Protein backbone atom coordinates (compact mmCIF):
# COMPACT_ATOMS: atom_id res chain seq x y z
CA UNK A 1 0.00 0.00 0.00
CA UNK A 2 1.49 3.36 -1.03
CA UNK A 3 1.81 6.48 1.10
CA UNK A 4 -1.15 8.32 -0.48
CA UNK A 5 -3.47 5.34 0.05
CA UNK A 6 -2.55 5.27 3.74
CA UNK A 7 -3.20 9.03 4.03
CA UNK A 8 -6.60 8.63 2.33
CA UNK A 9 -7.67 5.76 4.61
CA UNK A 10 -6.49 7.67 7.69
CA UNK A 11 -8.47 10.76 6.65
CA UNK A 12 -11.66 8.77 5.97
CA UNK A 13 -11.31 6.99 9.33
CA UNK A 14 -10.85 10.30 11.15
CA UNK A 15 -13.81 11.93 9.39
CA UNK A 16 -16.25 9.17 10.22
CA UNK A 17 -14.81 8.70 13.71
CA UNK A 18 -16.09 12.21 14.43
CA UNK A 19 -19.66 11.02 13.79
CA UNK A 20 -19.22 8.27 16.38
CA UNK A 21 -17.87 10.74 18.95
CA UNK A 22 -20.71 13.16 18.19
CA UNK A 23 -23.40 10.51 18.77
CA UNK A 24 -21.74 9.13 21.92
CA UNK A 25 -21.62 12.59 23.48
CA UNK A 26 -25.39 12.87 23.07
CA UNK A 27 -25.66 9.53 24.86
CA UNK A 28 -23.92 11.06 27.88
CA UNK A 29 -26.72 13.66 28.12
CA UNK A 30 -29.24 10.83 28.53
CA UNK A 31 -27.24 9.37 31.43
CA UNK A 32 -26.95 12.60 33.42
CA UNK A 33 -29.77 13.12 35.90
CA UNK A 34 -30.52 16.84 35.87
CA UNK A 35 -30.57 19.78 33.47
CA UNK A 36 -27.88 21.55 35.48
CA UNK A 37 -25.62 18.46 35.27
CA UNK A 38 -26.06 18.34 31.49
CA UNK A 39 -25.36 22.04 31.13
CA UNK A 40 -22.32 21.80 33.40
CA UNK A 41 -20.93 18.87 31.42
CA UNK A 42 -21.38 20.60 28.05
CA UNK A 43 -19.69 23.79 29.22
CA UNK A 44 -16.94 22.13 31.26
CA UNK A 45 -15.80 20.00 28.32
CA UNK A 46 -16.05 23.06 26.06
CA UNK A 47 -13.82 25.06 28.40
CA UNK A 48 -11.22 22.26 28.42
CA UNK A 49 -11.33 21.99 24.62
CA UNK A 50 -11.13 25.77 24.30
CA UNK A 51 -8.01 25.88 26.46
CA UNK A 52 -6.03 23.70 24.06
CA UNK A 53 -7.63 24.63 20.71
CA UNK A 54 -6.06 27.05 18.24
CA UNK A 55 -7.44 30.60 18.07
CA UNK A 56 -9.93 29.89 15.29
CA UNK A 57 -11.48 26.95 17.10
CA UNK A 58 -11.37 28.77 20.46
CA UNK A 59 -13.69 31.35 18.92
CA UNK A 60 -16.02 28.68 17.50
CA UNK A 61 -16.19 26.80 20.81
CA UNK A 62 -16.89 30.02 22.71
CA UNK A 63 -19.56 31.05 20.22
CA UNK A 64 -21.32 27.69 20.62
CA UNK A 65 -21.25 28.24 24.39
CA UNK A 66 -22.61 31.75 23.88
CA UNK A 67 -25.52 30.29 21.89
CA UNK A 68 -26.25 28.02 24.87
CA UNK A 69 -26.20 31.02 27.21
CA UNK A 70 -28.67 32.88 24.97
CA UNK A 71 -31.11 29.96 25.16
CA UNK A 72 -30.93 30.01 28.96
CA UNK A 73 -31.21 33.78 29.33
CA UNK A 74 -34.09 34.15 26.85
CA UNK A 75 -35.84 30.73 26.84
CA UNK A 76 -38.36 31.25 24.05
CA UNK A 77 -38.53 27.48 23.45
CA UNK A 78 -40.61 25.91 26.20
CA UNK A 79 -42.20 22.54 26.97
CA UNK A 80 -45.17 23.45 24.80
CA UNK A 81 -43.15 24.87 21.93
CA UNK A 82 -42.56 28.49 20.90
CA UNK A 83 -43.35 31.06 23.60
CA UNK A 84 -44.00 34.42 21.93
CA UNK A 85 -43.71 36.29 25.23
CA UNK A 86 -39.94 35.68 25.30
CA UNK A 87 -37.43 37.49 23.09
CA UNK A 88 -36.17 35.21 20.33
CA UNK A 89 -34.24 37.86 18.42
CA UNK A 90 -30.94 37.24 20.22
CA UNK A 91 -30.99 33.54 19.37
CA UNK A 92 -31.78 34.03 15.69
CA UNK A 93 -29.09 36.72 15.38
CA UNK A 94 -26.68 34.20 16.89
CA UNK A 95 -27.74 31.60 14.30
CA UNK A 96 -27.28 34.07 11.47
CA UNK A 97 -23.78 35.02 12.61
CA UNK A 98 -22.93 31.31 12.79
CA UNK A 99 -23.91 30.63 9.19
CA UNK A 100 -21.96 33.69 8.01
CA UNK A 101 -18.88 32.48 9.92
CA UNK A 102 -19.15 29.05 8.32
CA UNK A 103 -19.73 30.40 4.83
CA UNK A 104 -16.74 32.72 5.20
CA UNK A 105 -14.53 29.85 6.33
CA UNK A 106 -15.59 27.64 3.41
CA UNK A 107 -15.11 30.46 0.89
CA UNK A 108 -11.56 31.03 2.11
CA UNK A 109 -10.63 27.35 2.12
CA UNK A 110 -8.73 26.41 -1.02
CA UNK A 111 -10.47 23.78 -3.19
CA UNK A 112 -13.56 23.70 -0.95
CA UNK A 113 -16.78 22.59 -2.73
CA UNK A 114 -15.30 22.47 -6.22
CA UNK A 115 -18.14 20.14 -7.23
CA UNK A 116 -21.64 21.69 -7.20
CA UNK A 117 -19.94 25.08 -6.78
CA UNK A 118 -22.77 27.33 -8.00
CA UNK A 119 -25.52 25.34 -6.27
CA UNK A 120 -23.66 25.52 -2.97
CA UNK A 121 -23.05 29.27 -3.12
CA UNK A 122 -26.57 30.08 -4.33
CA UNK A 123 -28.12 28.00 -1.57
CA UNK A 124 -25.74 29.52 1.02
CA UNK A 125 -26.70 33.08 0.05
CA UNK A 126 -30.40 32.14 0.18
CA UNK A 127 -29.96 30.74 3.70
CA UNK A 128 -28.18 33.90 4.88
CA UNK A 129 -30.82 36.21 3.36
CA UNK A 130 -33.62 34.07 4.84
CA UNK A 131 -31.94 34.07 8.25
CA UNK A 132 -31.56 37.87 8.15
CA UNK A 133 -35.24 38.22 7.23
CA UNK A 134 -36.13 35.99 10.19
CA UNK A 135 -34.07 38.28 12.46
CA UNK A 136 -36.01 41.32 11.24
CA UNK A 137 -39.35 39.57 11.80
CA UNK A 138 -38.23 38.45 15.26
CA UNK A 139 -37.29 42.03 16.17
CA UNK A 140 -40.65 43.33 14.93
CA UNK A 141 -42.48 40.65 16.92
CA UNK A 142 -41.13 41.84 20.29
CA UNK A 143 -44.06 43.10 22.33
CA UNK A 144 -46.44 42.65 19.40
CA UNK A 145 -49.80 40.87 19.58
CA UNK A 146 -49.97 40.49 15.81
CA UNK A 147 -50.66 36.78 15.23
CA UNK A 148 -49.56 36.98 11.60
CA UNK A 149 -46.19 38.38 12.63
CA UNK A 150 -45.61 35.58 15.13
CA UNK A 151 -46.71 32.96 12.59
CA UNK A 152 -44.37 34.49 10.01
CA UNK A 153 -41.55 34.28 12.53
CA UNK A 154 -42.28 30.62 13.27
CA UNK A 155 -42.30 29.61 9.61
CA UNK A 156 -39.19 31.59 8.70
CA UNK A 157 -37.26 29.85 11.49
CA UNK A 158 -36.74 27.10 8.92
CA UNK A 159 -33.81 29.24 7.76
CA UNK A 160 -32.36 28.96 11.26
CA UNK A 161 -32.80 25.18 11.04
CA UNK A 162 -30.79 25.33 7.81
CA UNK A 163 -28.18 27.46 9.56
CA UNK A 164 -27.96 24.80 12.28
CA UNK A 165 -27.20 22.12 9.71
CA UNK A 166 -24.66 24.48 8.13
CA UNK A 167 -22.88 24.99 11.45
CA UNK A 168 -22.76 21.29 12.38
CA UNK A 169 -21.53 20.24 8.93
CA UNK A 170 -18.79 22.87 8.96
CA UNK A 171 -17.62 22.28 12.53
CA UNK A 172 -17.50 18.48 12.20
CA UNK A 173 -15.36 18.68 9.05
CA UNK A 174 -13.66 21.97 9.90
CA UNK A 175 -10.24 20.60 8.95
CA UNK A 176 -11.55 18.76 5.87
CA UNK A 177 -13.61 21.43 4.11
CA UNK A 178 -11.63 20.74 0.94
CA UNK A 179 -12.64 17.06 0.99
CA UNK A 180 -14.42 16.01 -2.20
CA UNK A 181 -17.30 14.58 -0.13
CA UNK A 182 -17.90 17.73 1.92
CA UNK A 183 -20.83 18.86 -0.26
CA UNK A 184 -22.64 15.54 0.33
CA UNK A 185 -21.89 15.77 4.06
CA UNK A 186 -23.23 19.35 4.06
CA UNK A 187 -26.43 18.33 2.24
CA UNK A 188 -27.03 15.50 4.73
CA UNK A 189 -26.85 17.87 7.70
CA UNK A 190 -28.99 20.50 6.00
CA UNK A 191 -31.55 17.75 5.36
CA UNK A 192 -31.41 16.36 8.90
CA UNK A 193 -31.98 19.75 10.50
CA UNK A 194 -34.83 20.50 8.09
CA UNK A 195 -36.50 17.25 9.17
CA UNK A 196 -35.81 18.25 12.78
CA UNK A 197 -37.64 21.56 12.16
CA UNK A 198 -40.72 19.79 10.79
CA UNK A 199 -40.74 17.35 13.72
CA UNK A 200 -40.70 20.29 16.16
CA UNK A 201 -43.39 22.06 14.15
CA UNK A 202 -45.86 19.19 14.22
CA UNK A 203 -44.89 17.72 17.61
CA UNK A 204 -44.22 20.78 19.83
CA UNK A 205 -44.07 18.65 23.00
CA UNK A 206 -40.77 17.26 21.71
CA UNK A 207 -39.32 20.75 22.04
CA UNK A 208 -39.73 20.51 25.81
CA UNK A 209 -38.05 17.11 25.95
CA UNK A 210 -35.12 18.25 23.80
CA UNK A 211 -34.68 21.40 25.89
CA UNK A 212 -34.74 19.37 29.09
CA UNK A 213 -31.96 17.12 27.80
CA UNK A 214 -30.07 20.12 26.37
CA UNK A 215 -30.23 18.68 22.85
CA UNK A 216 -30.71 22.09 21.23
CA UNK A 217 -27.55 23.40 22.88
CA UNK A 218 -25.52 20.22 22.45
CA UNK A 219 -26.12 20.18 18.68
CA UNK A 220 -24.04 23.36 18.38
CA UNK A 221 -21.50 22.65 21.12
CA UNK A 222 -20.48 19.01 20.69
CA UNK A 223 -19.59 19.35 16.99
CA UNK A 224 -16.81 21.78 17.93
CA UNK A 225 -15.03 19.45 20.35
CA UNK A 226 -13.15 17.05 18.09
CA UNK A 227 -12.17 19.78 15.62
CA UNK A 228 -11.07 21.91 18.55
CA UNK A 229 -8.90 19.14 20.00
CA UNK A 230 -7.12 18.26 16.75
CA UNK A 231 -6.53 21.95 16.03
CA UNK A 232 -4.43 22.20 19.18
CA UNK A 233 -0.76 23.13 18.72
CA UNK A 234 -0.11 20.57 21.48
CA UNK A 235 -1.55 17.75 19.35
CA UNK A 236 0.55 18.84 16.38
CA UNK A 237 3.64 18.91 18.62
CA UNK A 238 2.91 15.35 19.83
CA UNK A 239 2.45 14.16 16.22
CA UNK A 240 5.85 15.56 15.28
CA UNK A 241 7.55 13.63 18.06
Swiss-Prot record:
Q: What membrane topology is given?
A: Multi-pass membrane protein
Query: Cellular component GO terms, alphabetically?
Result: membrane
- Which UniProt keywords are listed? Membrane, Transmembrane, Transmembrane helix
The subcellular location is:
Membrane
Where do transmembrane segments lie in this chain? 12-32, 39-59, 89-109, 117-137, 152-172, 180-200, 215-235
> Of which family is this protein a member?
Belongs to the mimivirus L68/R809 family.
What is the protein name given in its UniProt record?
Answer: Uncharacterized protein L68
